[in-house]
Amino acid sequence: MRLDFVTLFIFWEGTAVASVFLIWARGTEGAYYTGMRYLIIQIASGVILVAGMALHYHETGSLAFGALTLGSLGTWAILIAFGIKAAFPLLHTWLPDAYPAATPTGTVVLSIFTTKLAIYSLARSFAGTEILIYIGTVMVFWPLIYAAAENDLRRVLAYALNNQLGFMVIAVGIGTPLALNGVAAHAVAHILYKSLLFMAMGAVLYRTGTAKASGLGGLYRSMPITALLCIVGGLAMSTPLFAGFVSKSLILSSVAKAYEPLIWAALLFGSAGIFYVAGVRLPYLAFFGEDKFAGAPVRPKEAPWNMLLAMGLTAASCFALGLMPATFMSFLPYDVAYDAYTPDHILTQLQVLSFTAIAFFALWRFGLIKRPAPGILVDSDWLNRRLALARAL
């Protein structure tokens, strides 16, 4: 099969059409309208992509899917199309809207494929494009604001996913072999630990009927294995001995070697922020704190064995890749010597993670952080609501 923009477009639109059924499978009226919004935005990205392809072909006579520079209207259109699917700032609202609306299994599948296609496309066409460094930096910070206040824990994970995409976009912007290895490694690690967290919240939704923090708490008493696996998913984001530590170390090192100290500091802060919202706050709100089921006639049961098996295998994969970094990195696209387990990498991450956890529990203990109240956070999708796209078509 020829690897050109025509082939990319076919699969680009194919993923959009196929994935919307994962949302509609939820079977609710809200899921139907969410699916329509998702489909409109994804098809729009395809239209922009084909327009960019046509302009690029007119300018160069080529449809080769390779390195591009932002020197023409066509390549800018292609970048915008990629940016929609990669959830660039202000183009990202479909992600926290659609992912929590899907079935528990559908959310996991969406988190694996949809945005990773865009990251692959960016890495193939725009590696070393400086503007991506700054776009990615905004992506690291912007979603944390919403994730820290969101009540729906599956939406928290959707915003956390957006944050992690920012790490990959920054590395694509750096564009060195080490950075692109970091993109590939982090895409794999992110698929594993974010799938584990989405599965844990899916199990909670399956057993309790809600993923809202305002209605959860104390579940560790009846879902201890799910609680443990959720904690493992949080640790796998950047704790030594897990896959996320190896992949984030690659990205942080590539940024440091590119002499971008402010971006490096931003990524370190972003690592702390995402561990706060998804690695500490999310498990605490779901499984600990006030027991919301203490007076219930029947307590929720532990997740079914098939869910536990899927989560267990994913957790083991996170651990295996972190425990064998040389094997992990042997599958990366570039042959670059790198040691993730140096004392400075380990100490830096452990300091960031431990101080973040201590800060959360200290703030919670003194009442400075409270369980979120029911409600809807209005993101930059307020325009959609104004234009009544909530009931499009």
Give residue ranges: language-model regions:
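Juxtamembrane/transmembrane-helix interface segments of polytopic membrane transporters
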Residues: 57, 202-206, 322-334
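Hydrophobic mid-bilayer segments of alpha-helices in multi-pass membrane transport proteins
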Residues: 10, 18, 51, 166, ...
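Membrane-interface and transmembrane segments of multi-pass membrane proteins
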Residues: 110, 296, 303, 307-321, ...
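Generic beta-strand/beta-sheet core signal
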Residues: 159, 321-322
